[in-house]
């Protein structure tokens, strides 16, 4: 088996359920390793510019970005905990010493409710589509990762988008599940099903190009590294390196879409909190024009290094743990098949005698 073909594996080599288990494990490990970096970043931001009530900020668990709405000053929330930090390392050490190591994962559990299922759907769909497209595309099979990545991202975003909308609305308006269901029914009655996918378009503008480029570069990079180091199967180091490089390239190219989407999400969340019309900033195009007018074209590339530092390790950890999980299940299946074959030989030999 060539290294480039090793990601999806041949039919029957690894089951979709095992792919789901591998991606679920990868998602949890990624969030546990990446979240502390974002928690420290948010604590440093809150120290420099305290978050007022209704202010929104972006929380990243390494899998998805989540818009969080600040609660009032009387509530003891993790991002308003007292502390004076001189830098990132100092913040890490003081948070662990003063608040306990668990504080580095503050706010993580609620975000995993959507992030883990979205990741499982995304990675499993990609592998299934990649295997199918490689067979169907023939001489153009090199482009299979491009199309498989784009389609898989559309699918996962479509499934998760209504849940993200509901989560943000519940947090910003402090509604119960019963009140929320009434709001949803009213929205469906007045605006139709489209109301549940508000913000879906801007999400796809960033995530679909990112996904297509990421998988295309990842498969190419993995194949090249395997060839370079004469590996028949990709090692953890190879998948980690290919994931980091492909994630970096995709994040740089799609940065303007990320800037626009994040600004739009934050503005929409704050307008919802203040009970103002969300139509003020509903257009992606208008947000982009406003950014250029206020900060020039360079404004669309704001946060270049923070995004790179966030995306590269997250992509590397996720893909390497996912590939490791698939390799584990592949080996398990082969051993099981070998044992079954050996048992059949023993039985047939016994019957002959």
UniProtKB/Swiss-Prot annotation:
It is a multi-pass membrane protein. GO terms for molecular function: glutathione transmembrane transporter activity. PROSITE patterns: SOLCAR (PS50920). GO terms for biological process: import into the mitochondrion. Gene3D superfamilies: Mitochondrial carrier domain. It holds the Pfam family Mito_carr. Belongs to the mitochondrial carrier (TC 2.A.29) family. The chain crosses the membrane at residues 20-40, 104-124, 143-163, 200-221, 237-257, 299-319. It is found in: Mitochondrion inner membrane. Disulfide bonds: none annotated. Keywords: Membrane, Mitochondrion, Mitochondrion inner membrane, Repeat, Transmembrane, Transmembrane helix, Transport. The gene is slc25a40. GO terms for cellular component: mitochondrial inner membrane; mitochondrion. This is Mitochondrial glutathione transporter SLC25A40. It comes from Danio rerio (Zebrafish). InterPro entries: Mit_carrier (IPR002067), Mitochondrial_sb/sol_carrier (IPR018108), Mt_carrier_dom_sf (IPR023395), Mtm1-like (IPR045315). It catalyses: glutathione(in) = glutathione(out). Probable mitochondrial transporter required for glutathione import into mitochondria. Glutathione, which plays key roles in oxidative metabolism, is produced exclusively in the cytosol and is imported in many organelles. Mitochondrial glutathione is required for the activity and stability of proteins containing iron-sulfur clusters. The lineage of its organism: Eukaryota, Metazoa, Chordata, Craniata, Vertebrata. Solcar repeats lie at residues 14-132, 140-224, 234-328.
């Amino acid at each position: 088996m060539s290294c480039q073909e090793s990601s999806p594996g041949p039919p029957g080599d690894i089951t979709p359920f095992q792919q789901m288990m591998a991606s679920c494990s990868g998602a949890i490990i990624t969030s546990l390793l990446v979240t502390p970096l974002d928690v420290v970043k948010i604590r440093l931001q809150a120290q420099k510019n305290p978050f007022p009530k209704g202010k929104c900020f972006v929380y990243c668990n390494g899998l998805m970005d989540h818009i969080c709405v600040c609660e009032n000053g009387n509530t003891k929330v993790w991002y308003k905990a007292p502390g004076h930090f001189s830098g990132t390392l100092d913040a890490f050490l003081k948070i662990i010493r003063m608040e306990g190591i668990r504080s580095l994962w503050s706010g993580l559990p609620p975000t995993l409710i959507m992030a883990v299922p979205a990741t499982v759907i995304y990675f499993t769909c990609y592998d299934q589509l990649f295997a199918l497209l490689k067979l169907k595309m023939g001489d153009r099979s090199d482009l299979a990762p491009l199309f498989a990545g784009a389609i898989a991202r559309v699918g996962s975003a479509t499934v998760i988008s209504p849940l993200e909308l509901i989560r943000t609305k519940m947090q910003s308006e402090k509604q119960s599940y019963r009140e929320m269901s009434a709001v949803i029914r009213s929205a469906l009655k007045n605006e139709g099903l489209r109301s549940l996918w508000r913000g879906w378009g801007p999400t796809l503008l960033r995530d679909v190009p990112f996904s297509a480029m990421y998988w295309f570069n990842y498969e190419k990079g993995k194949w090249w590294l395997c060839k370079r180091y004469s590996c028949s199967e990709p090692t953890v180091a190879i998948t980690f390196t290919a994931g980091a490089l492909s994630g970096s390239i995709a994040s740089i190219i799609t940065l303007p879409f990320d800037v626009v989407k994040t600004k739009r999400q934050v503005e929409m969340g704050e307008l919802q909190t203040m009970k103002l019309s969300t139509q003020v900033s509903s257009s992606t195009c208008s947000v982009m024009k406003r950014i250029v007018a206020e900060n020039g074209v360079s404004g669309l590339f704001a946060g270049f290094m923070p995004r790179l530092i966030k995306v590269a390790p997250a992509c590397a950890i996720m893909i390497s743990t996912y590939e490791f999980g698939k390799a584990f299940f592949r080996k398990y299946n082969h051993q099981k098949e070998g044992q079954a074959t050996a048992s059949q030989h023993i039985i047939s030999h016994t019957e002959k005698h």
